[in-house]
C-alpha cells in the first residue's frame, strides 16, 4: 500500500499538481461507470449508468445548471407557461441537427413527448409528468414552435424538462441520434462505452469556439472501486465521480489537491423489504414485511451514527427520510432524528406479537425471524453497512444473511424475478424538486421499489401519498406544494417503506490533468459541465488503448 501511495503521489507531482493548468482542445477523457448501462434509450433510463450516458449525450429543451441551480435555455431559446400551468410553449433554436445530420424541429419534440407519456412505453421519466387523468396534447404550429398541454396543472413544470432528452422522429438511427455534446460511437458490454464528440452540437463558448472541447469520453465499466482508484493514481482515469470515505482519506493523505468534498449530498443509502404480493417468498415473511411495526422496529435497531463514523469516516450524516437536509426548501425539518433504540425496538416487536426467546426472535407461529439482505458486490461501503446492520439486528434476535451480487444479477432479482427478501442500495436524486421522484412515490411507478407497478394502491397510506404527490404537482404555489410534500415525508417516516440510513458527503477525485471542473452536490457531480472540460496543456491527447 505504501509503494502504491508513493507512485500515486509522484505521478501528481510530475504533472504539476500544485500549479494551475491551462487547457487544450481535443483528447479523450476517461472515467468509470459503476455498472452496465441498462439502456441507451433516454425515455427508459432508470439506472445510474444509463443516466450518466443520457446526461452526456442527450439534448434537452431546458437545462438545470448544477452549480447555480437555475434553469437555462438549451434547445429552446425561451419558453412560457400558461397561468393554469397546464401548457408550456417552447421557442426552439433554428438550423440544428442531430449527431447523424438529421434536422431538428418541433416534430421531434412532439414525437418525444408522445412516446414519453405513452403508458405502453413505461417511461420512468414520464411518471413525473403524470398529474391527472387524460391525454397529452402537443401542437407544432411552426418548425421552431412546440406547444405542450397536459391534462392537469403541473407545478415546477419547466424543471422537469431537464430530464427529457429529445429523440429524432425521423432518423434511421432512432435513439442513437442525439443532440447533446457527445454520441455513443462504440459499446463493448462489460468493458466500456465510448462517446465521440458530436460535430453538430449547437453550443459555443464565449469566444465563439464550438463545444465540446474534448474529442471523446471513454466510460470504462468498472464495478470494483479499489481498482478504479488504482487506475486513477496511475493516470489512466481523470476523475472519479464518487469516492467512498476510505478511498477519499487514502487519496487525501497521498495528495490532498486531487480530492474534492462538495458537501452533504442529496442521495441517500437505504434498504427496503420486498412487499410485492407476487414475490416467491414464504407467507410468514410476507406478513413480517407488510407489518409497519416490524419495519419501524428494524429502523430503530440500526445505529446510523456508527454507520456514519465507521463506514464513512465521518463523511456522512444520519438520514431522516427521502430528502437530504442539503435540499433546504423541500426538507421537512419537523421530522425527528432517526432514533437508535434497540430496547424500544424489541419492545415494539413484542407488542406486535413476536417472541424473544434465548436471544432469538420468533413470530407468533414460532418461525425464527431471519431474512436475506442483498446488495451489490464490489461496493465496499455497502458491504460494510450490510454487516453492521446484520450485527445490529442480531441484538434484537433477528438473523440477517448478507448476500452480495453483481449488479446485473441484483437488478434481475429486483425488477424481474423478485427473488429477494430485502435490498440495500442508494437512491440517486437528479433534481431538488419532488416531481423528479414521481416514479418512486406513485404506487404505479416502476421505482416504487418495495412494491412496484401497482394497478391500484395496496395500502391506504400509499393511496394518500399518490393523492398528495399529484396534488402538490398541480398546486398553485411552492408553499402549497411544500405543505403536501412535508406530509408525504411524514407518512414515509411513519411507515418506513424505505429505511433511510445515511446521506453521504459528495467526495470526488479530480486529476490535475483535467481543467474546468467545478464539483457540485447535484448529479452528475464532477462532469455536469462536460462540454467545457479540457485536458491540461502538455497532457497526452491520444485515446487510451
Q: For each predicted feature, which ranges?
A:
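N-terminal lobe/hinge region of extracytoplasmic solute-binding protein
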Residues: 32-83, 114, 177
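Bacterial N-terminal signal peptides that target proteins for export
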Residues: 1-9
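A structural "hinge/loop" feature
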Residues: 35-52, 75-77, 102, 124-127, ...
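Extracytoplasmic
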Residues: 26-28, 34-35, 56, 74-76, ...
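Extracytoplasmic/periplasmic ligand-capture domains
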Residues: 67, 93-124, 138-139, 172-173, ...
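Sec/Tat signal peptide C-region and signal peptidase I cleavage site
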Residues: 19-23
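Bacterial N-terminal signal peptides
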Residues: 8-17
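Surface-exposed binding/hinge segments that line
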Residues: 24, 91, 125-171, 186-188
Amino acid at each position: 500500500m505504501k509503494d502504491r501511495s508513493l507512485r500515486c503521489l509522484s505521478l501528481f507531482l510530475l504533472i504539476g499538481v500544485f500549479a494551475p493548468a491551462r487547457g487544450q482542445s481535443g483528447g479523450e477523457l476517461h472515467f468509470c461507470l459503476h455498472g452496465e448501462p441498462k439502456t441507451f434509450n433516454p425515455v427508459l433510463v432508470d439506472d445510474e449508468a444509463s443516466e450518466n450516458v443520457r446526461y452526456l449525450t442527450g439534448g434537452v429543451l431546458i437545462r438545470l445548471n448544477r452549480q447555480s441551480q437555475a434553469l437555462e435555455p438549451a434547445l429552446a431559446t425561451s419558453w412560457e407557461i400558461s397561468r393554469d400551468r397546464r401548457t408550456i410553449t417552447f421557442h426552439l433554436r433554428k438550423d440544428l441537427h442531430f449527431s447523424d445530420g438529421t434536422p431538428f424541429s418541433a416534430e421531434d419534440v412532439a414525437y418525444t413527448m408522445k412516446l414519453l407519456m405513452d403508458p405502453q412505453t413505461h417511461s420512468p421519466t414520464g411518471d413525473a409528468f403524470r398529474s391527472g387523468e387524460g391525454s397529452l396534447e402537443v401542437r407544432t404550429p411552426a418548425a421552431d414552435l412546440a406547444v405542450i398541454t397536459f391534462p392537469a396543472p403541473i407545478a415546477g413544470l419547466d424543471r422537469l424538462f431537464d430530464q427529457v432528452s429529445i429523440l429524432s422522429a425521423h432518423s434511421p438511427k432512432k435513439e442513437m441520434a442525439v443532440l447533446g455534446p457527445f454520441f455513443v460511437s462504440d459499446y463493448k458490454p462489460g468493458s466500456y462505452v465510448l462517446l465521440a464528440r458530436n460535430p453538430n452540437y449547437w453550443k459555443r463558448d464565449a469566444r465563439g469556439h464550438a463545444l465540446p472541447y474534448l474529442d471523446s469520453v471513454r466510460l470504462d465499466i468498472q464495478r470494483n472501486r479499489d481498482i478504479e482508484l488504482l487506475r486513477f493514481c496511475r493516470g489512466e482515469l481523470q476523475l472519479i465521480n464518487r469516492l467512498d470515505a476510505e478511498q477519499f482519506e487514502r487519496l487525501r493523505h497521498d495528495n490532498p489537491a486531487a480530492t474534492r468534498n462538495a458537501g452533504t449530498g442529496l442521495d441517500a443509502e437505504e434498504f427496503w423489504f420486498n412487499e410485492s404480493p407476487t414475490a416467491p417468498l414464504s407467507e410468514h415473511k410476507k406478513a413480517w414485511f407488510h407489518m409497519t411495526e416490524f419495519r419501524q422496529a428494524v429502523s430503530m435497531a440500526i445505529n446510523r451514527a456508527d454507520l456514519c463514523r465507521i463506514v464513512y469516516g465521518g463523511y456522512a450524516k444520519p438520514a431522516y427520510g427521502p430528502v437530504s437536509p442539503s435540499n433546504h426548501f423541500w426538507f421537512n425539518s419537523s421530522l425527528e432524528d432517526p432514533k437508535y433504540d434497540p430496547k424500544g425496538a424489541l419492545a415494539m416487536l413484542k407488542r406486535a406479537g413476536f417472541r424473544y426467546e434465548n436471544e432469538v426472535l420468533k413470530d407468533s407461529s414460532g418461525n425464527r425471524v431471519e431474512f436475506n439482505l442483498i446488495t451489490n458486490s464490489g461496493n465496499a461501503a455497502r458491504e460494510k453497512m450490510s454487516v453492521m446492520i446484520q450485527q445490529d439486528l442480531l441484538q434484537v434476535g433477528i438473523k440477517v444473511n448478507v448476500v452480495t451480487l453483481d449488479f446485473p444479477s441484483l437488478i434481475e432479482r429486483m425488477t424481474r424475478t423478485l427473488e429477494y427478501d430485502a435490498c440495500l442500495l442508494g437512491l440517486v436524486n437528479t433534481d431538488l424538486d419532488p416531481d423528479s421522484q414521481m416514479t418512486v412515490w406513485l404506487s404505479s411507478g416502476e421505482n416504487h421499489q418495495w412494491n412496484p407497478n401497482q394497478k391500484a394502491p395496496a395500502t391506504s397510506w400509499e393511496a394518500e401519498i399518490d393523492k398528495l404527490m399529484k396534488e402538490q404537482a398541480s398546486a398553485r404555489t411552492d408553499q402549497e406544494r411544500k405543505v403536501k410534500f412535508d406530509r408525504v415525508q411524514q407518512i414515509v417516516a411513519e411507515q418506513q417503506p424505505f429505511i433511510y440510513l445515511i446521506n453521504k458527503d459528495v467526495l470526488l477525485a479530480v486529476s490535475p490533468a483535467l481543467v474546468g471542473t467545478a464539483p457540485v452536490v447535484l448529479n452528475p457531480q464532477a462532469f455536469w459541465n462536460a462540454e467545457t472540460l479540457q485536458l491540461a496543456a502538455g497532457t497526452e491527447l491520444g485515446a487510451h488503448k
